[in-house]
UniProtKB/Swiss-Prot annotation:
CDD domains: GIY-YIG_UvrC_Cho
UniProt subcellular location: Cytoplasm
UniProt organism field: Limosilactobacillus reuteri (strain DSM 20016) (Lactobacillus reuteri)
Keyword Phosphoprotein belongs to the record: no
Gene giving rise to this polypeptide: uvrC
Coiled-coil portions: none
UniProt GO BP: nucleotide-excision repair; SOS response
Chief place of localization: cytoplasm
UniProt protein name: UvrABC system protein C
Family according to the record: Belongs to the UvrC family.
Task of the protein: The UvrABC repair system catalyzes the recognition and processing of DNA lesions. UvrC both incises the 5' and 3' sides of the lesion. The N-terminal half is responsible for the 3' incision and the C-terminal half is responsible for the 5' incision.
Amino acid sequence: MASEHLEHKLALLPDKPGCYLMKNINDQIIYVGKAKNLKNRVRSYFKSSHTGKVAKMVSEVADFETIVTSTNKESFLLEITLIQKHQPYFNIKLKKGTGYPYIKITNERDPQIKIVSKIKKDGGYYFGPYPNVYAAEETMHFIQKVYPLRRCNGYQGRPCLYYHMGQCLGACFKEVPKSDYEEQIKKIKSFLSGNTATVKRQLTKKMQRAAENMEFERAAEIRDQLHYIEVTVEKQKIISNDKTPRDLFNFYMDKGWLSIQIFFIRQARLMKREKRLFPIVDTAVEEMTSFILQFYNRRNNILPHEILLPKGLPNKEISEILGVPVRTPVRGEKRDLLAMAHENAQLSLDEKFRLLEMDQSKTTGAMKEITDALGLPEGHRIEAFDHSHIQGADPVSAMVVFINGEPAKNFYRKYKLKTVINHADEAASTREVIRRRYSRLLKENKPMPDMIFMDGGEIQMDAAKDVLENELGLEIPVVGMVKNDKHQTADLLFGDDDHHINLNPRSQGFYLVQRIQDEVHRFAITFHRRVHTKHSLSSRLDEIKGVGPRTRTKLLKKYGSITKIAQASVDEIHSLGINRPTAQLIKVSLQKNAEVAKGSSHD
């Protein structure tokens, strides 16, 4: 089940293609994926049941990020880059082997096209990466049919089979002019860059001609090639045409907040994305300019060879200060990348505002729902109390404080009850803790809470109201938090006759009551366990002859538990300033107790 934070972010996902980055509690990226529809894909992880590796991954997700792209093809290319960059644990299968395949045109007299796993500085032309070998082979086979180079092993004195099939220029039996290869390579590069109009026209004419000649199999084959172009070969804006290291900045401003996206382009690929969100006091241009200059100065980054910025910024001044070219692209893929960064900046800020609205509804909005239901003026501070004991032993009380719907742990308090000893008395426990808490606030002239919540029913409420009104002269609304037979938050008790106030169980007000009740119960139980454990240790040591308060304090301070004292040697106990006979008696007594406890555990 997704946390509240994740639920809120899931509700804000866009219906757009892109990549998503799953993060664990340490903010480490543990999985990178792509999706045609980010909203549907990311939500599916948390709205469906899973098994195995997927279930394990989902269980570790504490947060996620998304990067919107223009097409699904861009999503794939970005996914590959992000996986190679971050090496996420749950993408392990994608990382195995020799890496992602590329299509290469070799730097030879008679060049050929092949699939490789690494890029080398050998003068060849590389295209990709592709998601797998199959995808690369599909593209290579298409090129071999439409733009043939050399497909055989070279000169052999006779035409090869591929020459007869139209998939080889004939290096097998003749000297092919270099200009022929250069022309084909030019067409291949244009085609793989997304310029498909020319080849589509050519193939359409061939398909029509084949159909007219009743060559239906040939027409169907060409039809499949056209379909391949339409669904697979798109202009890949996420990849730059050259390998110049670039940083790209764009921003979006609304309601006094500035959202910045930074794309780091290296080796013709988007290697990294960073985002910043913060309120601003100056104009967007001034704040953005200051941010860019501080970004490189503070981080001590290695400057790229070029910085791309949106229009309206002082490019000349920034360039002079940083010492690198700063440009604003007006067309082509760089402009499209700027547009993508702007869209992501807007989405990030929209998400921020929606999350702030949701947080407000959970806190101050929830407080208003409660006060409205109780018929009280709007309040800000709630103090809640609960008691804890084991069959009356070691009774304690605890108080938690919520201000504007959020826990204020600095104001939490713990109480060891003094008037209730070795028996359970909810009314007496309530009277004591309420008296101690609010008589002190009166004495110190400190502000009172707007409401007091008691974990319990009429007994606790009546006791609290009696002390407040009749002993201290205070008028503070007292509300009871009632649980059902499943020990879950049910409703509230309030008013002179302690009548039930029903809150909508799906409302933020109800969730706040639930959080308060769970928190005060947790705090009381934790405190009681510590008190009871310490008391039990003291009791067991007090039973040993010769162990008084001073010796007991030495032992507990040094070892902290009966088990660790029992494991200590006589010499170690003696070294604390305890005489040897007593040290020996402590050792023997605790060992006997441990053996008895061990034996009884097997009964």
